[in-house]
Amino acid sequence: MTMIGQAEGLVALQPEGWPAPKGYANGMMGRGQVVFVGGQIGWDAEGRFADGMVGQIAQALRNILAVLAAAGAGPQHIARLTWYVTDMEAYRANLKPLGRAYREVMGANYPAMAVMRVIELVEPAALVEIEATAVLPE
């Protein structure tokens, strides 16, 4: 098991012999206070949805950062993101612009991630919901 990098008390885990992940980590390890961010969708503080999959993902990520800021945390503290998308084809068709939007909001912070398709979300106009788990160092 190789431990890659160390940002703000978090270490990315990489099993020996596995290909390097691109845009995510296979695992993360950290010690400190854990912050759980409930599912964030692509609307702003006034309840207005961003346009399209890429816009909603960028807004959901900004919403995650707003919650983390309330705990004194930032994107470098995120250990895990779980993405729920209503249209996997739209997600796959937009991987490059999604990657750009992700880096614009989160920088080069790539935690453990999972993406799954769901039939629908509670808010009918929502195309994505993202949960986050962060660790603030001791």
Residue ranges, per PLM feature:
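N-terminal presequence-like segments and the immediate start of the first folded domain
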Residues: 1-79, 85-138
